[in-house]
């Protein structure tokens, strides 16, 4: 058993004196930046989400996922795989675009209850909860941009993004269930084709970690993802999932630098994994055999969007990989939310913030895990470019500007499917 002391930083974002320009704001802003540089994520304490609202969103998810499959399948979107997803009843999710806007949520509930006016109570609960997650996201994004001296771009940046919400349900596989394998989850991830999932099945990776570019696979091959997979299989499956749009971030001396902040993940789903894991807040995370891998509700990955704000309620499951390749098992506590940086933030900040590898590993027998998350997504027709203020001799530019749609096409090309670190292959500056 490893150390029990590892845990994510806990930052209070609900302090009554936490106002922009105040000394408390500067203090918390510094803590947020350090947490994102060191871990790529942190636990946010935010008691502005009442316990009553937390219970309401849980009951809402239970009610939604209890609907017949044919009803849930009405949750559709013009983009494939953005709506309802189900894989062998091991996990399923529902998707809502701009869930902080009541009109959009009403459209969602009307899909499920088309012969009435939707479900007013469910719509209102989702809206209220989404609004609180958006509050956290906006506060953190403002702090990050201020901390790097690019606060003059904040307003344009905030206007350039939109939100996608996912309500998720995970069921722990029964002990000894030989029918549930990593291949099952890889197949699921391939079907999550529009949420930015990029699984690499059976790959053999052993990569180093950089101090400055800590976990951006596009910057440093395998940063934060030291996976030893001795399977002899080198056929990589790269599937991007676009719960994404594009975001316009005005950065860099009058240049309307464009950024892709799409929701997506870069997944390493390895058969016969030898994962050297570390202990976490309370428990060691051991994943040295196939039985442990069967518990994965979502294999190891990095998000591709800007930020994810996650609520996992009472049942744990989220695990985050540290710089030194140890796993932190994040234990839920009241009024806390997990803020996770994505690959797009790494690119936007020129590698100064890391996007952590993380996974979902459900271990509690016969207990269903419900989570809700807001993903900060880009609006259409923009590309990523780090602002000039973040590029200097010590921090040379790591990425060429790129349009998300072109990157997405590359992901699905024959060449893209053969490359593990697709973003790096597509747009990394060669001198970096």
UniProtKB/Swiss-Prot annotation:
Signal peptide: none annotated. 2-oxoglutarate binds at residue 369. Disulfide bonds: none annotated. Gene3D superfamilies: B-lactam Antibiotic, Isopenicillin N Synthase, Chain. Binds 1 Fe(2+) ion per subunit. Keywords: Dioxygenase, Iron, Metal-binding, Oxidoreductase. The keyword Iron applies. PANTHER family: 2-OXOGLUTARATE (2OG) AND FE(II)-DEPENDENT OXYGENASE SUPERFAMILY PROTEIN-RELATED. Belongs to the iron/ascorbate-dependent oxidoreductase family. 2-oxoglutarate-dependent dioxygenase involved in glucosinolates biosynthesis. Catalyzes the conversion of methylsulfinylalkyl glucosinolates to alkenyl glucosinolates. This is 2-oxoglutarate-dependent dioxygenase AOP2. It comes from Arabidopsis thaliana (Mouse-ear cress). The lineage of its organism: Eukaryota, Viridiplantae, Streptophyta, Embryophyta, Tracheophyta. The gene is AOP2.
């Amino acid at each position: 058993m490893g150390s029990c002391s590892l845990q994510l930083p806990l930052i209070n974002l609900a302090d009554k004196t936490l106002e922009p320009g105040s000394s408390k704001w500067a203090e918390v802003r510094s803590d947020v930046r350090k947490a994102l540089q060191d871990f790529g994520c942190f636990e946010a304490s935010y008691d502005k989400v009442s316990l009553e609202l937390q219970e309401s969103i849980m009951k809402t998810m239970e009610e939604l996922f209890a609907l017949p499959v044919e009803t849930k399948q009405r949750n559709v979107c013009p983009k494939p795989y953005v709506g309802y997803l189900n894989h062998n009843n091991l996990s399923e999710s529902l998707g809502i675009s701009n869930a902080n806007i009541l009109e959009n949520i009403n459209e969602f509930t009307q899909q499920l209850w088309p012969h009435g006016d939707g479900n007013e109570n469910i719509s209102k609960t989702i809206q209220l909860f989404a609004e609180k997650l958006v509050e956290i996201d906006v506060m953190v994004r403002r702090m990050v941009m201020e901390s790097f001296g690019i606060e003059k771009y904040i307003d344009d940046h905030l206007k350039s993004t939109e939100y996608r919400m996912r309500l998720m349900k995970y069921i722990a596989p029964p002990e000894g269930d030989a029918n549930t394998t990593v291949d099952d989850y890889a197949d699921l991830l391939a079907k999550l084709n529009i949420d930015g999932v990029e699984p690499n099945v059976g790959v053999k990776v052993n990569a180093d970690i950089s101090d400055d570019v800590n976990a951006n696979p596009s910057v440093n091959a395998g940063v934060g993802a030291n996976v030893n997979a001795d399977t002899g299989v080198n056929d990589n499956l790269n599937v991007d999932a676009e719960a994404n749009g594009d975001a316009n971030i005005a950065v860099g001396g009058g240049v309307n630098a464009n950024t892709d902040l799409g929701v997506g993940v870069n997944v390493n789903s390895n058969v016969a994994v030898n994962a050297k894991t570390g202990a976490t807040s309370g428990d060691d995370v051991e994943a040295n055999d196939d039985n442990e891998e069967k518990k994965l509700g979502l294999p190891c990955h990095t998000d591709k969007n800007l930020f994810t704000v996650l609520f996992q309620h009472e049942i744990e499951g989220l695990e985050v990989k540290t710089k030194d390749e140890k796993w932190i098992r994040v234990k839920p506590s009241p009024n806390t939310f997990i803020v996770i940086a994505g690959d797009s933030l790494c690119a936007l900040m020129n590698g100064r913030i890391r996007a952590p590898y993380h996974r979902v590993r459900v271990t509690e027998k016969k207990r269903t895990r419900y989570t809700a998350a807001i993903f900060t997504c880009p609006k259409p027709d923009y590309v990523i470019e780090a602002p000039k203020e973040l590029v200097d001799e010590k921090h040379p530019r790591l990425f060429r500007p790129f349009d998300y749609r072109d990157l997405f096409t590359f992901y699905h090309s024959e060449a893209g499917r053969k490359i593990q670190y697709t973003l790096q292959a597509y747009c990394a500056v060669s001198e970096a």
